[in-house]
């Protein structure tokens, strides 16, 4: 390594794939850039292995290096990420939402991603104005995107649509309109859940390969907006699901959305009551202390986009860093 590490650097990933055919506005980290980023991390920081991470959760000092984490239980993670990690002898933590495999349905948050990826923000907003105008705020407020997406490079229409569905509307309000929007975007043939997410067999395969598989809620709703009872249910359903299929709550919990506004002290209590030893959020800093000295139910993670070769690609199969 040419650069010494001073602690554990958790890094968060979502979509990692060679391309996104048919989704011209869909942001993802290209597989080529992911592999370049791994090579760069190997040179500059090194990686945290399974045993070192487990020792830290048991009370040991914070290990040095990059801790690789992957959210949402996406099909990308078994098809593309796992082979890349195995080829390099690397460890990763995979946090899985239980809803898709249990209900056979795509989560609302990913319906939004797919519709935006297919149509783009302006066309989605135009469809909403024509078909669900009653859900939209006053015209003068429609340009106000959420501060939660301030760090994203998406256009303002895309940020507004994400804010509307992920933060402003209730589950009941967004349910039917999202179904209709997705049906419109894909001309009546939207993706199937098993084409988008890990199934139970894939979860067991990750565990057999030595990866950590942990809980990431049931529906990926914003936890802080749910009742205390619903928050407890979200945590426990997810924990039970991953443990039924080779994972463990011992790998900790991962908050959906992850920003400070997305969870609350009530959420932290629910995670602790479920027996998870810690929980990951999103905050751009390293971990230098033992777990007992950290705020264990609000651990930080960096976004992979903040590092070299982390620029999002769109639609095609050419790595962003190669353009």
Model-derived regions: residue spans:
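CE4/NodB-like, metal-dependent polysaccharide N-deacetylase domain
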Residues: 11, 61-62, 74, 83-95, ...
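A short, conserved beta-to-alpha structural element at the edge of catalytic cores
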Residues: 89-115
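Histidine-centered beta-alpha loop that forms part of the nucleotide-sugar donor binding/catalytic region
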Residues: 13-14, 97-99, 218, 284
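Solvent-exposed loop/turn segments at secondary-structure junctions
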Residues: 99-102, 220-221, 260
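C-terminal active-site subregion of NodB/CE4 polysaccharide deacetylases
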Residues: 1-69, 76, 107-116, 208, ...
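Histidine/lysine/aspartate-rich catalytic loop segments that bind and position anionic ligands
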Residues: 201-203, 207-208, 212-213, 217-228
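Extended, charge-rich helix/loop segments that form flexible
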Residues: 105-209
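Short amphipathic alpha-helices and their capping/turn segments at secondary-structure boundaries
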Residues: 1-3, 82-87, 197-208
């Amino acid at each position: 390594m040419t650069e010494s590490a001073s602690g554990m650097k958790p890094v968060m990933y979502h979509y990692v794939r060679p391309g996104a055919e048919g989704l011209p506005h869909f942001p993802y980290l290209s597989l080529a850039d992911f592999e370049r980023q791994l090579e760069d991390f190997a040179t500059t920081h090194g990686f945290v292995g399974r045993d070192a991470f487990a020792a830290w959760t048991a009370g040991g000092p914070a290990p040095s290096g990059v801790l690789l984490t992957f959210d949402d239980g996406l099909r990308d993670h078994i098809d593309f990420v796992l082979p890349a990690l195995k080829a390099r002898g690397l460890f990763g933590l995979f946090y899985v939402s239980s809803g898709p495999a249990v209900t056979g349905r795509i989560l609302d948050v990913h319906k939004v991603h797919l519709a935006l990826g297919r149509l783009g923000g302006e066309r989605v907003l135009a469809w909403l104005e024509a078909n669900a105008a009653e859900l939209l705020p006053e015209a003068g407020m429609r340009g106000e995107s959420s501060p939660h997406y301030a760090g994203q490079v998406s256009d303002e229409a895309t940020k507004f649509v994400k804010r509307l569905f992920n933060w402003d509307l209730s589950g009941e309000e967004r349910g039917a309109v999202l179904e209709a929007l997705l049906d419109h975007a894909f001309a009546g043939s939207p993706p199937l859940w098993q084409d988008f997410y890990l199934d139970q067999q894939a979860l067991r395969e990750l565990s057999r390969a030595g990866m950590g598989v942990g809980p990431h809620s049931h529906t990926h709703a914003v936890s802080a907006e749910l009742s205390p009872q619903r928050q407890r249910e979200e945590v426990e359903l997810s924990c039970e699901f991953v443990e039924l299929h080779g994972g463990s709550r011992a790998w900790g919990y991962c908050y959906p959305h992850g920003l400070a506004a997305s969870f609350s002290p009530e959420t932290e209590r629910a995670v602790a009551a479920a027996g998870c030893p810690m929980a990951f959020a999103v905050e751009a800093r390293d971990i230098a202390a033992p777990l007992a000295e950290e705020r264990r139910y609000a651990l930080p993670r960096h976004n992979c986009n903040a590092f070299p070769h982390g620029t999002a690609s769109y639609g095609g199969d050419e790595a962003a860093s190669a353009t």
